[in-house]
Amino acid sequence: MALLTTGKGFVRALEKSGALGVYAPLEGGFEGRYQRRLRTNGYDSLSLTARGLGDVSAYLMGVHGVRPPHLGKKNIGQGAAVGPIYFVPPIAAYQLESLSPQSKGLVLWILEGYILSKAELEYLVSLPQQEPRIKVVVELGGERYFRWEPLENLIAVA
């Protein structure tokens, strides 16, 4: 029964592999339960969508530049023709700096992970080896029941 699951197997699998691929029922609700179980086990959770990530490594761990939409306004003779660049701090590295000392680490829960390329998924597999306090959960699709598998096993199959 879904209501009686404790999530211990999920947490153990995440701690062992560092990056998991998840298939969840499309009606939703299961992700929140497992995120809550991660938080009760001492992890902080950050949910983000794979759409619009751009360069995953720069977005998560490096300072990167973004250009806001121009909204029809132009700066004639000032700056680049394509608009100004604003530099944004890395999302995951910034969250790691603000973790409490008793926290086990940060879990990046990435929604709509099926749009990520194989190279981006390989980077997400290597991220927990680069920074041991980061764990990664990528939602890769729908299933009739909530199931997970190490992300590197899923990449090897694809």
Curated annotation (Swiss-Prot):
What's any one GO cellular component for it?
plasma membrane-derived thylakoid membrane
Main subcellular location: membrane
Its top-level enzyme class, in one word, is: translocase
What Pfam families does UniProt report for this protein, alphabetically? Answer: NdhN
Kindly state which keywords UniProt assigns to this record, in alphabetical order.
Membrane, NAD, NADP, Plastoquinone, Quinone, Thylakoid, Translocase, Transport
For this protein, the record's InterPro entries field holds: NAD(P)H-quinone_OxRdtase_su_N
Q: Which reaction does it catalyse?
A: a plastoquinone + NADH + (n+1) H(+)(in) = a plastoquinol + NAD(+) + n H(+)(out); a plastoquinone + NADPH + (n+1) H(+)(in) = a plastoquinol + NADP(+) + n H(+)(out)
Q: Where in the cell is it found?
A: Cellular thylakoid membrane
- What's the EC number here? 7.1.1.-
Picking any one GO molecular function of the record gives: oxidoreductase activity, acting on NAD(P)H, quinone or similar compound as acceptor
Q: How does it sit in the membrane?
A: Peripheral membrane protein
Q: What does this protein do?
A: NDH-1 shuttles electrons from an unknown electron donor, via FMN and iron-sulfur (Fe-S) centers, to quinones in the respiratory and/or the photosynthetic chain. The immediate electron acceptor for the enzyme in this species is believed to be plastoquinone. Couples the redox reaction to proton translocation, and thus conserves the redox energy in a proton gradient. Cyanobacterial NDH-1 also plays a role in inorganic carbon-concentration.
Oligomeric form and interacting partners: NDH-1 can be composed of about 15 different subunits; different subcomplexes with different compositions have been identified which probably have different functions.
The entry's family comment says:
Belongs to the complex I NdhN subunit family.
Protein name in the entry: NAD(P)H-quinone oxidoreductase subunit N
Q: Which organism is it from?
A: Crocosphaera subtropica (strain ATCC 51142 / BH68)
